[in-house]
Amino acid sequence: RIVYAAKGDGVLSAGGACDALGIAPEDFMLNVPAWLGEKPALEAEEDGSCDVLIIGAGNAGTTAALKCAESGLKVILAETQTYDEYDEYACDMAMYNSKLFLDKGTPEIDPMDIFNEYMRLYRGHAHQSIVRDFATRGGEVLDWMVDTYIPAEYTDAYAKTSNYKGNDNFSGICAGQYSFRGMTQWRDVDTNVNMWPFVIRTLHTAFEGLGGEIRWGYQGIELVGGNGEAVTGAVFKDIDGAYKQVNAKVVICCAGDFGGNPDMRLDLSDQMRNLAWSFGKDRTDVASTMGMGRDGSGIRMCLWAGATMEGGPRAGQAAGINGVPGFAFGGAWPCFGGDGKRFMNESLIKHGSNGYLDMLPADSLLVNVTDSNWETYLSYQGYGHETMDRSSDYMVEEVRENMKNYVTGADGFDVRAFARFGKEYSKVYAAETLDELADIVGYTGEAKKNFLAEVAHYNEMCEAGKDSDWGCDPQNLFAIKDAPFFASFSKTSNQVSGGLCQHAAVCTDGSYRVLYGDKTPIEGLYAAGNNCGQRYGIQYATPTAGNSCGSALISGYCAAEHVVESLGK
């Protein structure tokens, strides 16, 4: 039977619902947030015109500009950074089925397997056309850049085709998740310097060689038009503080995310805001959420023109996710908590799997353990951020040498890390017995007894080939039985993980046209990269590391194709 409660403010009524409390807008959510405000009314000096105006010279903006220019269009590329200060965050790019991999013998991957895996991880919240472009066009875009515009000596020196050889015993799927090969990493192997900011400048030079113009130190402020009218340009603020208007037939916004804007981050990143609240922090305080990224100006410009933000939960790049310690050589390993017991399925190592680790109290001990068979165990692992690139022969040899020359004791020893292509090292701890290893990592009393008993129990499950406790993938059940024994360990901070950049942005259609709330396109306005929403759905995920940069490059290229077609070229 249905029970009706007497109605009043917040009192439950039929079916468990309740009356609205009549909260005033200023105490709740605003359709025009304070960080957005009203579109400014600026007096700007006209400063040229073009067929295509592209705002932002990052990954998406650069490929968009280059693709439009080679089609014969007059293109202006505007970038808020000056030429001297220009930088790009990352150098990892997942772009599948490139000749860089295929020519080395890497098997071609079925693009539909890639597409379906990403859509599954996004729980259907991403735009299928945009994700399909990422899955099917990446190799084409990377080959286009490398074959046509990037000097061969730069590709030879810096383009590292991660895991192109594969891994001897890896099945391709771990704990139900695919792991694909396809990340190119642009790094100098000796200095550990990210070389992509240097290499992308060769694309800028090629763009200028095709007649394109780059406006450095041009901060985008507002679009011209929108709200029922065609977008016909944008207003910028130059390095001298003067407002300049550039007119165009089409504008492509590629100005990056809002992760570097504390107010937008607090308001728009519902995941981060509410994660902070779950830690007892003030979710109205911008200091409760941290992160990195751009200033959100491209998104604000689109919103002033009538665009809407994609729905939530809004994906951040690893926002709210903490992982287990890991070894210098990567991989998923048995992990033991502060009480000496396992507490998770370690083979679920991709972004989006470990977020609950944020729920552990401060100073919780986390310990990864393996034994002398560590390299054999590595041959069963996939290709994510957390895994060893066994295609880098010189790095493999150095790791083998480091591990061969292990030093027992509490001081540990250095092992070359596989997180990046360069000279990075991490501590590994060694002991001749598990009892000694327990002392080194800090287990005492009951926790030490639990740890030794848990290892014995874990080894029994490895022998049986089934993890009946946590469901670790059988190919990753690595017994801890042969000395020497190795560990890595750390303690939790109980701090909210801000992750990297934010991937939520404005709603677009499958042609990268920015949409009004009724999902009709805003004439003359396109978006790519982190200005383009619905690329990730609810969370960033890594069947291959580097798909954020890869997606940006691909979306810029594909958006440009649609622009070229719309202009009849």
PLM features: what roles do these ranges have?
Residues E70-A90:
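Glycine-rich FAD pyrophosphate-binding loop
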Residues E222, T433-E436, I440-R535, Q539:
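A glycine-rich dinucleotide-binding beta-alpha-beta segment and adjacent secondary-structure elements
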Residues G241-G320, P543-A545, C549-C558:
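Glycine-rich loop(s) and the adjacent beta-strand/alpha-helix scaffold that form part
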